[in-house]
Amino acid sequence: MKTAHEIRPGNVIMLDGSPWVVQKTETTRSGRNAAIVKLKLKHVLLDSGTEQTFKGEDKMDVIVLERLDCTYSYFADPMYVFMDADYNQYDVEADNLGDAAAYIIDGMEETCQVTFYEGKAISVELPTHIVREVIYTEPSARGDTSGKVMKPATITGGGTVTVADFVKVGDKIEIDTRTGEFKKRA
């Protein structure tokens, strides 16, 4: 049993007797109240999705499923194909990747963990930190140095990340895949 606050994207939880893949988590805190955790979920067996809200201390069953270390191979619409060390290929639907799809690129060297439920690949968990190149961002605003200045940047793979003002096109940056936050220049 894990608390709702400990749940991460890629986890599979049991709700009302059915397995659900967590695609996104969002935690909000208020001054007097406990943390509220909003989970974006996709049913493992059906193609339905939902959003559920829990208190941070709510307990839920996390299913321990088979996981394999795999590398990204190619995209065959609407499937992402991953390959293990024995050259077995596994198809994962694009919908099952959630926000992780923005970080998956051709030639990706990072190893991902593919999760299986009843023999079917249902989700992919990326490494905690990945390095991607900035392909577009606005130039820095001259003289705007008060506080922590951030701006949007498009990275290889098409995802958008909020980066520090000093980041330029062509820079390689480190991103935390759990939160989608810029960490540092690589």
UniProtKB/Swiss-Prot annotation:
The keyword Protein biosynthesis is annotated on this UniProt entry: yes
Family the entry assigns: Belongs to the elongation factor P family.
Matches recorded under SMART domains: EFP (SM01185), Elong-fact-P_C (SM00841)
Pathway(s) the chain acts in: Protein biosynthesis; polypeptide chain elongation
Protein name: Elongation factor P
Keyword annotations: Cytoplasm, Elongation factor, Protein biosynthesis
HAMAP family according to UniProt: EF_P
Annotated GO CC locations: cytoplasm
Location in or out of the cell: Cytoplasm
GO molecular function annotation: translation elongation factor activity
Protein purpose: Involved in peptide bond synthesis. Stimulates efficient translation and peptide-bond synthesis on native or reconstituted 70S ribosomes in vitro. Probably functions indirectly by altering the affinity of the ribosome for aminoacyl-tRNA, thus increasing their reactivity as acceptors for peptidyl transferase.
Any single biological process term in GO: peptide biosynthetic process
Residues making up the signal peptide according to the UniProt record: none
InterPro entries: Elong-fact-P_C (IPR015365), NA-bd_OB-fold (IPR012340), Rib_uL2_dom2 (IPR014722), Transl_elong_fac_P/YeiP (IPR020599), Transl_elong_KOW-like (IPR013185), Transl_elong_P/YeiP_cen (IPR001059), Transl_elongation_fac_P (IPR011768), Translation_prot_SH3-like_sf (IPR008991)
Source organism of this protein record: Shewanella denitrificans (strain OS217 / ATCC BAA-1090 / DSM 15013)
